[in-house]
Amino acid sequence: CIRDRQYNMMPRLQVSCTNENLVINSNSVPHYSFIPMTPNDLVERDEEWRVPLEPTLDPSREATNIGANGPVVLGYMGFTNTGLNIFGPTEGGQPANQAYGDPVYNNILDDCGGHTAFAYHNHALNIRCFNPNGLSSNPVTDPQPEIIYFSLIMGYAPDGFPIFGPHEYANNDGVNVIVPESSYELIDGENPQIN
């Protein structure tokens, strides 16, 4: 679906606070070069997200955004700190031959983990596209600026809780950054989305 078309749009991101909320306004345009991976055009779409400055846990702790066909996570799950929607890991019901499919496997995501539908959005997050020390128009192929500090937060969920990247501080000094090892273990025969 690659088309030879120039997209001359500039990203817009504004952040402010009220007494209770972080308010983010964006036009849903990525800060890097847009590569069409679907037949949908890149369009500006005004977004405003309001998340609480002091998030609290939902007492019901029930799964949200579950599809009608069982544990299929669809649609809006949060937003990036660069002003783009984050959607669930699966696609919607169209096209029928890829319904609820894996957008990575179906090769419909750009190098930063996003594509267009109603507007540009991410299904996956590539840490190279979130380097706070210098934004690049081609973050995957351009040389990366030296990482002086890490942005531990890559975005926010609608409830205000941060979405963290792969780095964390080794201790409370705010200096030593590490990539922690996961203790996640997949048990044969169990679906990790529902257990």
Can you annotate each of these PLM segments?
Residues R3-P103:
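Solvent-exposed N-terminal domain segments of exported/luminal and surface proteins
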Residues W49-V51, F79, C112, N122, ...:
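Generic structural hydrophobic/aromatic packing signal, biased to beta-strands
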Residues N106-G114:
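Short, recurring structural edge motifs at helix starts
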Residues G114-N195:
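Domain-length functional cores that host ligand/cofactor binding and catalytic or interaction surfaces
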